[in-house]
Amino acid sequence: MKTQQSYQQRDDKGTLYLVATPIGNLEDVTFRAIRTLKEADQIAAEDTRQTKKLLNHFDIATKLVSYHEHNKETMGKRLIDDLIEGRTIALVSDAGMPAISDPGYELVVSAIKEGIAVIPIPGANAAVTALIASGLPTESFQFIGFLPRQKKQRRQALEETKPTKATLIFYESPHRLKDTLDDMLLILGNRHVSICRELTKTYEEFLRGTLEEAVHWAREATIKGEFCLIVEGNGEKVEPEEVWWESLSPVQHVEHYIALGFRSKEAIKQVATDRGVPKRDIYNIYHQE
């Protein structure tokens, strides 16, 4: 086991600070974060243009360097060398906690291997912020982050989360939201969901309902902003009065999904999931008529 005494005097190596930044509202930054950013020898940022806005707002003149997915190997080595030489580096992401859904994780691992102190400066986090306002269970949750861009890989990832009883937390971009909601309904079934948009910003919005309702909303809405999706875990079914397909025959049920853009095979699978019956039964009923 390696031991780190975070605030013990260290004269040899520097310190890597993981500094949380606001997820939208600049008033959410902490006094400690501002002090750390001012006192660091340099700030490593995912997008220097975005971080520069924050630094200018709080009159922070610390040297700013770029550290992102495409330069993480070369820049990561340079940052580690600086830390070994005794410099202090503050790592930030575009918004929220660094090392969450960004390459900061690799830098943390490298720093720990070199015996460099890694100190978190906590603050805003979109996932937890969305979760506590979702109305879904908070005692157990699993953070998934961004799903794969490709449909096949995205559906496979959702299949892997399907048995999870904990509340699920996803991030999604506006141009992929519709496809993601379609796949969630197909794979996970008609669970409760909270769609959180533009957290802490002027146009912050929460849409709470079922995945079926979310799919309908997304097909009609103009999708803008960054999204956090909080999805009910497996095992907590929608209340009986909310079973929207109860009045439909199996054939009408399949045709409903086809009208939403599902292929017949996908529609049959989803109907079987909704009704809790074998897929073969729905297939036979649908093709007999």
From Swiss-Prot:
Name of this protein: Ribosomal RNA small subunit methyltransferase I
Broad class of where this protein is predominantly found: cytoplasm
Enzyme class, first EC level, given as a word: transferase
Family to which this protein belongs: Belongs to the methyltransferase superfamily. RsmI family.
Organism, scientific name: Halalkalibacterium halodurans (strain ATCC BAA-125 / DSM 18197 / FERM 7344 / JCM 9153 / C-125) (Bacillus halodurans)
PANTHER family: RIBOSOMAL RNA SMALL SUBUNIT METHYLTRANSFERASE I
Family annotation (HAMAP family): 16SrRNA_methyltr_I
InterPro entries the record matches: 4pyrrol_Mease, 4pyrrol_Methylase_sf, 4pyrrole_Mease_sub1, 4pyrrole_Mease_sub2, rRNA_ssu_MeTfrase_I, SAM_MeTrfase_RsmI_CS
Annotated TM spans: none
Catalytic activity, as annotated: cytidine(1402) in 16S rRNA + S-adenosyl-L-methionine = 2'-O-methylcytidine(1402) in 16S rRNA + S-adenosyl-L-homocysteine + H(+)
Compartment(s) of residence: Cytoplasm
The enzyme's E.C. designation: 2.1.1.198
Any one Gene Ontology cellular component term annotated for this protein: cytoplasm
Annotated function: Catalyzes the 2'-O-methylation of the ribose of cytidine 1402 (C1402) in 16S rRNA.
Keywords: Cytoplasm, Methyltransferase, rRNA processing, S-adenosyl-L-methionine, Transferase
Molecular function GO terms recorded: rRNA (cytosine-2'-O-)-methyltransferase activity
Pfam hit, one: TP_methylase
